[in-house]
C-alpha cells in the first residue's frame, strides 16, 4: 500500500549492535542477482538527503558475466564494513581503517600502506542511490522503469499497517485466530535474541525483565488480577469485546502503530471495535428499534422493507455466547501485558527529564534510540540525567568529564537493542531477519574467496594489469582523505558495456566515478587525472582528495561509477584527532568519540561545523591582516602626503618643466591613437572580395527566404480569409437556426398559454355556474326571510290600525258632545242680548246680531282650547257617521254633509304621523327615531309617553267665533290641533315612514324616519 513520505524521513539508524534495522527502507535488488548486500552498521548504507531512502543492492553471483573469474588476484570485491565485531577492532588502527577489495584494500598514512586482510568483508559490486540534487546521471539510467523503482521503496506507515492487520485478524477463522494469539502470547515469555545462555539462569534477567518487557513476576501478577476481573465482573458482551481488544493489541504491536507520534491509532482501532460490538448487540438493536417504532420515526413496514440491506452479522437473533477458556486466557494475558507496557511507558515519560533543545533539528538516525535509551535508563534505576548526542548515543553530564558512561556497557546496549527490537513492526522484524541472514551469507562467502597477503604499496602495483578499476587510500588527515585510483577504461572495454563508444564519458579527462561520504553525495571531493605518468607503467591514473571532514570521526566513503551508478568499493576510515592547539580550541569536538560512521545528516552537520570553524579562523586571520594592512596604508599615505608637499613647494621653473613634459606625453599618445584609427579606416575601406561574395550570397539567401516568407504570409492570409468566410456563413446559419428555434419556442409557449387558458376557462366556467347557483339559492332564502318579516310587520300594522280606529271613534264621540254643548251655549247667547261684560262691549268688538250669524256657523268648532265660562265638558259620544278632519284634505264638520267621508276611511298613511296646528307648541319640531335620538328626542319622548297627562280639551267661544269670521279658515283645525298623537305599541326597525297633511290654507307637512318617528315639521 502507498506510504507517506513523512515517515520515511524518520528512519532509524541501522546499527547492528543496537539490534535495529531500517524500518523505513526496503531492499532493492540489482538486475544481475537477487542476493542482498546490506550492512546494518550504519556506514555502508548510503542514504539520500532529499528522499531519505536507501537502495540495498545485491552482490553479483559467480555466474555474472560482467565479473571475470580467471584468477583470484584479478577478481575485485566491493568493500563493506565489518559486523559489530569489526567495531571492536576499529581502534587498533592508528589513523583509520579500511575495508575494501578482497585482495587489495589499503589504508596508508604518510606513504605506508597497511593491509586489512582480517577486516575485509564485503560482496561484489554494490550500489547506492544518488541524491536528488547535484548528483551525476548517465544516459543508462533512462532505461530504469519507474514502476520498478517505486516498487523498491517501502515507507513507514504504522496507521495503515495496523488497520490492515486488524481487518485481516477480524476475518480469520476462530481456530486460526486462536493460534495467532497463542504465538503472540508466547513471544512475551521467550528471552530476547541478544540474551546469552547464561542470562536464563540470572535472577535479574528473569525477575527484573530485559529492557522493554516487564519481569516474570509482574506478568504473572497482572495476569492473575485481570483473570479475576474477567471472571467476576465481566458479562458476556464485555468478554467478547475484550477478546476483540486483544486482536487490536496484536495488530498495534505487529503494525507498529503504538509508538512515536501514532498514539491516535489506539483510539481509532478501539473505536472501530467498540462501534462494531454496539451495532451487533441484540439489546442495543432492540432498544433503538423499539424507540424508533414508539416515536413513529419509522414504521414497521419500512423496517421490514429495508432490513434485508443490513449484513447478516448485524441482524442478531440470539444473544452472544461466552468465549472458550483457552481464548479467554490468551486475551487476558495479551491485555494484561498491554496495560503493563502502557503503565511503564507512562512512568518512564513522567520521571525522565526531557533532553535539552538546541534549536536545531536532531538527526533522525541519531534520535532513533532516544526513547529506548530513556526506558533502559529508567528500568536500570540510573539517576544520571542524559540526552542524545549528535552520533545517536546517550551522553550524560559525567561523559564530558570522564568520556565514559555506564550506559554504554555491553549489558545496557543489549537491553537497548532488545527494547528497540520489541518496538519494531512485524514487517520490519522480518526485513531485519532477512537482511541479517543475507549479510552473514555474503560475509562468509567473501571470506571464503579472500586470501590474506603481505602489505603492499603503490610501487608494488607497478606493472600489474587488473580486469577492473581499483581505488585505495593514500593519506588520511584530520580533515581530508586522499586517494588514488587505477584505469577504468580497461574495465569498461573488458565488460563489453560499450559505455565509452556511446560517449558516456565524453572525454578522457571526465571523472569516471564520484564519491559519497556516509551515503551523501560529497561536493567537496576533487578528482584529477594523472597526465605525467606513462600509460601502463603505473597503476595510478586518478588522484583525488575528500576535504571538509571533521577530526576524530568515522566515515564510510563510497566510490560509485558515473556511467552505471555501480559502487566500485566502500571504504570505512576514521580521521585522527587534530594536534593543532589553536584549531582544537576553535573547533568543538564531539563530546564522545564515535567508532562507527554517522548518518548522512550527522556527517554533513559535522562537516559544516568544521568548515565554519575553519572559516572563522580564516576570518580572524583576515581581520588581523586587514588591521595590519590599514596600518601600512596609513604609513604609505603619510609618505605620499610628504612627497606631494615637497613637490608643490618647488619653484615655478620645475613646475613649468613638469607641465611641458606632461603635454608632450599627451601629444605623443594622441598621435599614436590617430595613426591607429587611420589604419583601421584604411582596412575598413578595402572590403575583401571573399567577404563581399559571402555577403552577396547571404543577401540572396535572405531575399529568397524573404520571398518564401511573403508567399507563406499571403497563403496564410488567403486561408484565414476563406476560413473567416466559412466561419461567418456558419455563424449566420447558426444565428438563423437560433432565431427559428426562438420563434418555435415562443410559438410553443404561446400555444401552451392558450391551452392552459382554455383549460382554466373550462374549469372556471364550471365553478362560475356552481357559484351562481349557490348565490341564487342564498338570495331566495334571504327573500323568503324578508317576506316573512314583512308579513309579520303587516299583521302588526293592521292590528295597530284597528286600535287607532277604535280610539278615533271615541274622540269623535267626544267632539260630537262638545259641538252639542257649543250649540247650546250659542243658543243661550242669542237668547240673551246683553253684553258679555258688565261694563259693556269691549272697544273694537263688533257685536253681532242674531240675523248676522248664520245657522251653519253654530256647528263650527272654536279655534281655541279655552272652554266657555271656564268649564270643561266631558267627552260625549258622537254619532257613528261623524268623522274627524283628515290630514289629506279639509272636510265639513256637519254630520249630515253628503261629501264627508265616513270616519273609518279617514286614517293617516302612517300610524305615527299626524299634522299639528299652531296651538300645540310642543310639537313644532321633527324628531328622530328612537334608534338615533338627538338632544330634543328626550323632550319628544317624555311628551309622547305622557300623552295621558295633557290638559282636558277646552274651547273659548269668542276665539272660535273670531276664527269663523276669518276667511279661508279651516273648521276642523281646532279639532285637528287639539288631538294628541297616539303612540304605537310597537317599533319597526329598518323601515321608512312618511306622512303629509293639509289644512284649509293649503299648508302641508312631511316627515321621514324610522317607525318610531311620530311628527313631521310643518311649513
From Swiss-Prot:
Transmembrane spans: 163-183, 216-236, 259-279
Taxonomy, superkingdom: Eukaryota
Biased composition range(s): Low complexity: 44-66
UniProt-annotated location(s): Membrane
Bias-annotated ranges (Gly residues): 992-1008
Region of interest (Disordered), ranges: 1-94, 109-143, 343-371, 580-603, 831-855, 879-905, 963-1019
Coiled coil regions, renumbered to chain: 602-788
Biased composition regions of type Polar residues, renumbered to the chain: 30-43, 68-83, 131-143, 580-589
Keywords for the protein's UniProt record, in alphabetical order: Coiled coil, Membrane, Transmembrane, Transmembrane helix, Ubl conjugation pathway
Listed GO CC annotations: membrane
Membrane topology annotation: Multi-pass membrane protein
Function: Component of the regulatory network controlling carbon source utilization through ubiquitination and deubiquitination involving creA, creB, creC, creD and acrB. Involved in resistance to acriflavine, and required for normal growth on a range of sole carbon sources, including fructose, cellobiose, raffinose, and starch, and reduced utilization of amino acids, including GABA and beta-alanine, as sole carbon and nitrogen sources.
Family, similarity comment: Belongs to the acrB family.
Record protein name field: Probable ubiquitination network signaling protein acrB
Species per Swiss-Prot/TrEMBL record: Aspergillus fumigatus (strain ATCC MYA-4609 / CBS 101355 / FGSC A1100 / Af293)
Lineage start: Eukaryota, Fungi, Dikarya, Ascomycota, Pezizomycotina
Amino acid at each position: 500500500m502507498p506510504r507517506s513520505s513523512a515517515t520515511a524521513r524518520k528512519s532509524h539508524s541501522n546499527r547492528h549492535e543496537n539490534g535495529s534495522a531500517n524500518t523505513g527502507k526496503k531492499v532493492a535488488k540489482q538486475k544481475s542477482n537477487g542476493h542482498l548486500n546490506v550492512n546494518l552498521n550504519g556506514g555502508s548504507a548510503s542514504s539520500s538527503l532529499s528522499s531519505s531512502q536507501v537502495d540495498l543492492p545485491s552482490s553479483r553471483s559467480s555466474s555474472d558475466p560482467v565479473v571475470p573469474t580467471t584468477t583470484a588476484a584479478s577478481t575485485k570485491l566491493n568493500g563493506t564494513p565489518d559486523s559489530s565485531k569489526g567495531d571492536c577492532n576499529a581502534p587498533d588502527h592508528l589513523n583509520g581503517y579500511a575495508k575494501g577489495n578482497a585482495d587489495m584494500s589499503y589504508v596508508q598514512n604518510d606513504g605506508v600502506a597497511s593491509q586489512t586482510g582480517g577486516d575485509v568483508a564485503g560482496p561484489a559490486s554494490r550500489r547506492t542511490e544518488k541524491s536528488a540534487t547535484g548528483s551525476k546521471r548517465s544516459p543508462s539510467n533512462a532505461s530504469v522503469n519507474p514502476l520498478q523503482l517505486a516498487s523498491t521503496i517501502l515507507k513507514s506507515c504504522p496507521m495503515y499497517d495496523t488497520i490492515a492487520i486488524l481487518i485481516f485478524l477480524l476475518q480469520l477463522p476462530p481456530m486460526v485466530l486462536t493460534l495467532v494469539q497463542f504465538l503472540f502470547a508466547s513471544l512475551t515469555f521467550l528471552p530476547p535474541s541478544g540474551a546469552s545462555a547464561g542470562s536464563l539462569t540470572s535472577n535479574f534477567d528473569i525477575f527484573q525483565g530485559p529492557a522493554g518487557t516487564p519481569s516474570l513476576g509482574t506478568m504473572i501478577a497482572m495476569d492473575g488480577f485481570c483473570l479475576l476481573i474477567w471472571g467476576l465482573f465481566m458479562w458476556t458482551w464485555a468478554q467478547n469485546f475484550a477478546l476483540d481488544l486483544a486482536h487490536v493489541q496484536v495488530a498495534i504491536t505487529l503494525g507498529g502503530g503504538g509508538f512515536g507520534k501514532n498514539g491516535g491509532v489506539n483510539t481509532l482501532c478501539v473505536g472501530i471495535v467498540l462501534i462494531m460490538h454496539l451495532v451487533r448487540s441484540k439489546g442495543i438493536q432492540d432498544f433503538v428499534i423499539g424507540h424508533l417504532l414508539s416515536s413513529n420515526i419509522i414504521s414497521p413496514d419500512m423496517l421490514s422493507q429495508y432490513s434485508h440491506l443490513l449484513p447478516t452479522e448485524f441482524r442478531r437473533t440470539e444473544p452472544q455466547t461466552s468465549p472458550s477458556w483457552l481464548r479467554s486466557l490468551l486475551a487476558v494475558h495479551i491485555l494484561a501485558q498491554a496495560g503493563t507496557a502502557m503503565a511503564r511507558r507512562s512512568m518512564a515519560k513522567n520521571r525522565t527529564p526531557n533532553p535539552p533543545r538546541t534549536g536545531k533539528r536532531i538527526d533522525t538516525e541519531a534520535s532513533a534510540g532516544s526513547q529506548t535509551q530513556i526506558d533502559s535508563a529508567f528500568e536500570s534505576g540510573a539517576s544520571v540525567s542524559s540526552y542524545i548526542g549528535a552520533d545517536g548515543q546517550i551522553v550524560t553530564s559525567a561523559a564530558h568529564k570522564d568520556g565514559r558512561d555506564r550506559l554504554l556497557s555491553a549489558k545496557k546496549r543489549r537491553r537497548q537493542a532488545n527494547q528497540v527490537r520489541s518496538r519494531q513492526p512485524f514487517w520490519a522484524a522480518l526485513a531485519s531477519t532477512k537482511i541479517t541472514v543475507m549479510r552473514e551469507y555474503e560475509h562468509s562467502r567473501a571470506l571464503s574467496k579472500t586470501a590474506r597477503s603481505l602489505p603492499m604499496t603503490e610501487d608494488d602495483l607497478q606493472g600489474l594489469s587488473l580486469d577492473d578499476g581499483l581505488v585505495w587510500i593514500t593519506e588520511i588527515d584530520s580533515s581530508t582523505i586522499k586517494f588514488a585510483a587505477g584505469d577504468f577504461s580497461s574495465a569498461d572495454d573488458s565488460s563489453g558495456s560499450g559505455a565509452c563508444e556511446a560517449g558516456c564519458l565524453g572525454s578522457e579527462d571526465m571523472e569516471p566515478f564520484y564519491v559519497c561520504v556516509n551515503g551523501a553525495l560529497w561536493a567537496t571531493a576533487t578528482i584529477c587525472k594523472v597526465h605525467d605518468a606513462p600509460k601502463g607503467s603505473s597503476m595510478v591514473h586518478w588522484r583525488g582528495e575528500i576535504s571538509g571532514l571533521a577530526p576524530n570521526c568515522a566515515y564510510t566513503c563510497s566510490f560509485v561509477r558515473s556511467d552505471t551508478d555501480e559502487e566500485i568499493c566502500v571504504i570505512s576510515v576514521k580521521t585522527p584527532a587534530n594536534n593543532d592547539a589553536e584549531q582544537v580550541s576553535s573547533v568543538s569536538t564531539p563530546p564522545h568519540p564515535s567508532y562507527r560512521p554517522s548518518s548522512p545528516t550527522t556527517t554533513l552537520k559535522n562537516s559544516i561545523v568544521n568548515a565554519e570553524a575553519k572559516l572563522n579562523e580564516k576570518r580572524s586571520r583576515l581581520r588581523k591582516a586587514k588591521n595590519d594592512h590599514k596600518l601600512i596604508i596609513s604609513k604609505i599615505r603619510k609618505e605620499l602626503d610628504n612627497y606631494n608637499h615637497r613637490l608643490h613647494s618647488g619653484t615655478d621653473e620645475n613646475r613649468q618643466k613638469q607641465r611641458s613634459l606632461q603635454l608632450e606625453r599627451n601629444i605623443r599618445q594622441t598621435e599614436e591613437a590617430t595613426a591607429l584609427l587611420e589604419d583601421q579606416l584604411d582596412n575598413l575601406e578595402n572590403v575583401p572580395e571573399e567577404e563581399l561574395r559571402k555577403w552577396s550570397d547571404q543577401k540572396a539567401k535572405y531575399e529568397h527566404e524573404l520571398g518564401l516568407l511573403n508567399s507563406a504570409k499571403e497563403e496564410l492570409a488567403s486561408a484565414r480569409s476563406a476560413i473567416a468566410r466559412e466561419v461567418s456563413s456558419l455563424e449566420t446559419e447558426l444565428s438563423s437556426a437560433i432565431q427559428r428555434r426562438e420563434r418555435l419556442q415562443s410559438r410553443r409557449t404561446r400555444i401552451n398559454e392558450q391551452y392552459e387558458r382554455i383549460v382554466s376557462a373550462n374549469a372556471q366556467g364550471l365553478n362560475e355556474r356552481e357559484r351562481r347557483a349557490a348565490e341564487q339559492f342564498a338570495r331566495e332564502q334571504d327573500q323568503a326571510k324578508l317576506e316573512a318579516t314583512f308579513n309579520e310587520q303587516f299583521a302588526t300594522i293592521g292590528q295597530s290600525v284597528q286600535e287607532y280606529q277604535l280610539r278615533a271613534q271615541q274622540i269623535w264621540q267626544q267632539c260630537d258632545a262638545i259641538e252639542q254643548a257649543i250649540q247650546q251655549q250659542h243658543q243661550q247667547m242669542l237668547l240673551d242680548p246683553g253684553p258679555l261684560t258688565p261694563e259693556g262691549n269691549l272697544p273694537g268688538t263688533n257685536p253681532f246680531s242674531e240675523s248676522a250669524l248664520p245657522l251653519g256657523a253654530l256647528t263650527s268648532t272654536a279655534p281655541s282650547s279655552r272652554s266657555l265660562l271656564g268649564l270643561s265638558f266631558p267627552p260625549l259620544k258622537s254619532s257613528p257617521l261623524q268623522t274627524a278632519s283628515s290630514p289629506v284634505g279639509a272636510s265639513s264638520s256637519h254630520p249630515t254633509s253628503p261629501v264627508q267621508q265616513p270616519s273609518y276611511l279617514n286614517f293617516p298613511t302612517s300610524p305615527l304621523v299626524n299634522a299639528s296646528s299652531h296651538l300645540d307648541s310642543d310639537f313644532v319640531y321633527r324628531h328622530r327615531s328612537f334608534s338615533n335620538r338627538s338632544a330634543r328626542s328626550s323632550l319628544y319622548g317624555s311628551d309622547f309617553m305622557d300623552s295621558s297627562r295633557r290638559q282636558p280639551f277646552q274651547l273659548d267661544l269668542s276665539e272660535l267665533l273670531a276664527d269663523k269670521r276669518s276667511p279661508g279658515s279651516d273648521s276642523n283645525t281646532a279639532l285637528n290641533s287639539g288631538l294628541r298623537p297616539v303612540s304605537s305599541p310597537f317599533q319597526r326597525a329598518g323601515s321608512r315612514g312618511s306622512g303629509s297633511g293639509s289644512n284649509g290654507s293649503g299648508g302641508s307637512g312631511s316627515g321621514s324616519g324610522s317607525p318610531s318617528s311620530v311628527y313631521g315639521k310643518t311649513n
